[in-house]
């Protein structure tokens, strides 16, 4: 275990230890070539940012914000801010002008760092409406800054405020030469000494599924406690190569990336989530945090290949998965030693067929893969373990600085649970089976939201999560968001997320919103995976002029109904989807139907598609 460092000096302490070893793997904006940055280079850039922020007039506990996708400069900026006790606030790269204006005003942001052209254009337009905002700093050098914008500068020019000459760092002598040229480094080091665990590190704005935006306050003390608590059960280390899939705005990715850096692992910065599988095949990571939807898509793709395979090849694939499931689920997950004949059979299939599946994903050197953020289908979880990948299922919130509970690598676990609570997190089940939390990693509250804070914490200091769940044999099981639970007109309770996760394993389903509240039966709005559906239509001679016509075709509806019925076989009658509508377009953030983390805003969907929903309940 590494020596724990305050985030303000973490990168510099690691540079002393690891020097010229690669710390970050990344691609420059617009480039397809992967490059690396050493710990020494990382440290120097962070110091330059710290010096530049002081020269811009930033004072301790004032705020900057980063409005960008994952990139190298994002990390430089965050850790540079921590070095001078400045609060760094991440904005989702997809945020609207209205959202960023609200957050800038609420937090009093002084400097806004932006990524690409789209983010700069939004920032430029709202700048006159944000009286606290002094400057815009642009990461991507190809961005066209308006000729009428005296307030924006490129990141390279920003760095020159921290040091007159931005050179590359090749060795220790370069490091000393550049550091000697940092104009305010002595002040930076004084601020390192003043840094404390009560300082605000980040404010993370969560829009939530109900649309109300609130800033979660995260302190250095919370990060410190989270690093210690996670280190016991999440064994990332110096030899790991950790790829980023989720945006750094997401607390799961942020906390996970900081844990990896704390342990001396190398970070692989993936900028575009849509290119993650290509990035994995090119960089061969050992670890990655993700949401279940990533693994659902992997499962669907592998399942489709098996279905398309010929007789003997298909049988071999199916046998390999069956053996992998028996070995990893029936024995290892329960802490039991597999019998010798099963060990031998698994070794054979693992070295041949299962290793090919992992190679296709770029995961030949796989270590483990934390997964959280939504319900994981048992079918998908079993599949991931069956192909020989260690999925660590967990549960957490922004308010808990990510992890509340997780599986422990090498220890028994139960499919369907979200693991065991971390040692320093106290979990209690309250009224309506609500999960309550208390501990050092839990937020002190929401920024400027005193009334909301009074509601969120009870008199004993427990934070009310709004999630329903239960504890069994020391493991935590999730039921549903309490606000999302539907009650049919017949008095039956429906958990929409659980039902949706069952259908999302089908290769024809891209998005689904279950409808049931105060209705006499369950229905659903389903967005098909159009590429797969259109290919199916062509193969079966089904002509269509557009997606709307395709979605209404009786043959398509019959095929989808049969697939849904198959997936629902083990469910109670009242839980089953009785009617559904295929949607000719996706649910979107632009229409307010999805959060920035792509979760459904059910109330908006129900409002936007009221007529479509009502039609499903007509006699």
What are these regions (language model features)?
Residues 36-40, 192-193, 201-227:
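Conserved AMP-binding A3 loop
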Residues 224-241, 248-351, 355, 365:
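Conserved AMP-binding/adenylation subdomain of ANL enzymes
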Residues 19-22, 160-205, 212, 235-241:
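Conserved pre-ATP/AMP-binding loop-to-beta segment of ANL
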Residues 95-125, 226-243, 273-287, 360:
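Conserved ATP-dependent adenylate/AMP-binding module captured primarily in the ANL superfamily
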Residues 421-488:
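Conserved ATP-binding/catalytic segment of the ANL
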Residues 486, 511-514, 520, 561-619:
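Conserved C-terminal "lid"/linker of ANL adenylate-forming enzymes
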Residues 24-71, 75-79, 96-101, 154-157, ...:
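Conserved AMP-binding/adenylate-forming core of the ANL superfamily
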Residues 11, 55-56, 83-173, 559:
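Structural core segment of the AMP-binding/adenylate-forming
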